[in-house]
Design a protein with these regions (language model features):
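Basic, glycine-enriched DNA-binding surface that flanks or lies within the catalytic cores of DNA
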Residues: 2-109
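Phosphate-handling DNA/RNA-contact segment within nucleic-acid enzymes
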Residues: 64-177
Length: 179
């Protein structure tokens, strides 16, 4: 992908100013748009299908006409998983040609927000198994590596902190899972 950006630094996408395209498990053309973001991590199509409700492509339209696109994992509060409070961003190429940008979208609630996903749509409060990760990519890779040996993994809840775990993130999950 040619580098068309003139700015010196990649800025995170503001969650209030981005267009989001969901992965469509039935539309091969839409799936192809996501492939570059998963290929370098070895995340196969089966794993993408398992988590298809829990990631999107976020696009920020810049004033100079170019677009910043990245793979985004929506973050929610444990007590209200239907309300997106931020995005864990991955996969945007950096201007210097090095590794891709990873971080949190501008405006994200990084203190309390978490990526909370379950292939079987198991609610957090009903989960028998919860797996914690520092990134959603790592959670998906873990699922992919172990799904054949552990059929129950589909019912588990996978959580990404998007970086370092905070006390509020931990408390939020514990409040929903400990009777």
């Amino acid at each position: 992908v040619p580098n068309l950006y003139l700015q010196l630094e990649m800025l995170p996408i503001d969650i209030t100013e981005s267009d989001n395209q969901k992965f469509d498990s039935k539309d091969r053309e839409v799936q192809k748009k996501f492939a570059p973001y998963f290929k370098h991590r070895g995340i196969d199509l089966g794993t993408q299908h398992a988590f298809y409700r829990d990631f999107c492509l976020a696009t920020r339209h810049c004033e100079d006409g170019h677009r910043d696109i990245c793979l985004a994992f929506p973050m929610a509060l444990p007590q209200n998983t239907d309300r997106i409070v931020g995005f864990e961003e991955c996969g945007r190429a950096r201007l210097d040609g090095q590794d891709s940008y990873k971080g949190m979208a501008e405006g994200s609630n990084t203190d309390e927000g978490l990526w909370i996903a379950s292939p079987a749509r198991t609610p957090l409060a009903e989960a028998k198994h919860i797996y914690w990760f520092g990134s959603a990519y790592d959670a998906m890779a873990f699922y992919q590596l172990h799904r054949a040996q552990n059929q129950e993994l589909r019912k588990a809840v996978f959580i990404s902190t998007g970086g370092d775990l905070t006390e509020k993130q931990m408390r939020g999950v514990l409040e929903q899972t400990i009777p």
